[in-house]
Amino acid sequence: MKDKNCLFDLINKIESIDNVSIKKAQTELDRKMKPKDSLGVLEDICKKTAGIYGYPLKKLEKKCHIVVAADNGIIEEGVSSCPIEYTSIVSEAMLNQIACIGIFTKTLGIDLNVVDIGMKNDIKRNYPNLIHKKIRRGTNNFYKERAMSINECLEAIFTGIDIINEKSKDYDMFSNGEMGIANTTTSSALLYSVTRQNIDDIVGRGGGLSDEGLNKKKKVIIEACERYNTFEMDAVEMLASVGGFDLACMLGIYVGAALNKKLILVDGFISSVAALLACSLNKNIQDYLLFTHKSEEPGVNIILDYLKEKTFLNMNMRLGEGTGAVLACPIIDCAIEMINTMKSPEEVYNLFNK
């Protein structure tokens, strides 16, 4: 059986990206027909991509977006304004390309997969891009008992790793998102556990909570985290105590991307919490992550500060699903095309000064 030691042994194998290739990319960028560093984030993207894949850069043509869907027992405490049935309904709408992430991925030519890691309800129709990995029908109510067992948490993490291991032969890069009721509550509890920052700076309204619901959400998180003393736990123990199957699987997806040396785009608040936990297990994982857009959820600022990261899209979005991450894909494509195609001043002079 895959235990925690097996997971940590695997994670410890993750290496940092190649600094020699980063320097080669920097040299090439500096000789282009532009002022030094004038393309800002696009140059950063080129260097990160070079570090992961080597230089010269190849086009990242085959892109895969993975939405992880699960439900959370903490909904019993009134911390979400959405009914739990919403998870499977919206997930099926994604698969039919009529929910936002389905529309975006179709428009951008990105392959979409939805993973049922723990939805309460089943999607009864068959879809080729629906991955059935249900551990059980939602987590426990973490206010009353721990969200899941350590073994269930490990199963969710290894599921994420295995999905990337399987798909890495067919795809150049990945992005991920989530779908699940009350997962801003689980994410906020995890962020509170890692950083112990002021709860008012961490917890947002999620799907649209009232003032009363927001205060209840904060109270539930504080009391549960203090009861379990999550502040002294590692990422796996935290997830088992106050997390969700979706967050555990996303952590595994980040680990899998780093193990397979693939770029993976980080979306908003919930995706960023999973990324924070992954990086707490091996800092090298951060080398393979590209943080894309700044969510409207307040806790994302704490994560970005904690990891010393910046996003390059700010669109007042807080939908989830990975919608912000996939919108970054054309920017990445342009960055790679730029470094591969743009000429130096001397080359342009020789071409046209005739």
UniProtKB/Swiss-Prot annotation:
GO biological process: cobalamin biosynthetic process
Catalysis performed (reactions): 5,6-dimethylbenzimidazole + nicotinate beta-D-ribonucleotide = alpha-ribazole 5'-phosphate + nicotinate + H(+)
Superkingdom to which the source organism belongs: Bacteria
Active site, UniProt feature: 321
Residue ranges of coiled coil: none
Stored CDD domains: DMB-PRT_CobT
Alphabetized InterPro entries for the sequence: Nict_dMeBzImd_PRibTrfase (IPR003200), Nict_dMeBzImd_PRibTrfase_bact (IPR017846), Nict_dMeBzImd_PRibTrfase_N (IPR023195), Nict_dMeBzImd_PRibTrfase_sf (IPR036087)
Name of the molecule in the record: Nicotinate-nucleotide--dimethylbenzimidazole phosphoribosyltransferase
Species: Fusobacterium nucleatum subsp. nucleatum (strain ATCC 25586 / DSM 15643 / BCRC 10681 / CIP 101130 / JCM 8532 / KCTC 2640 / LMG 13131 / VPI 4355)
Name of the gene this protein is made from: cobT
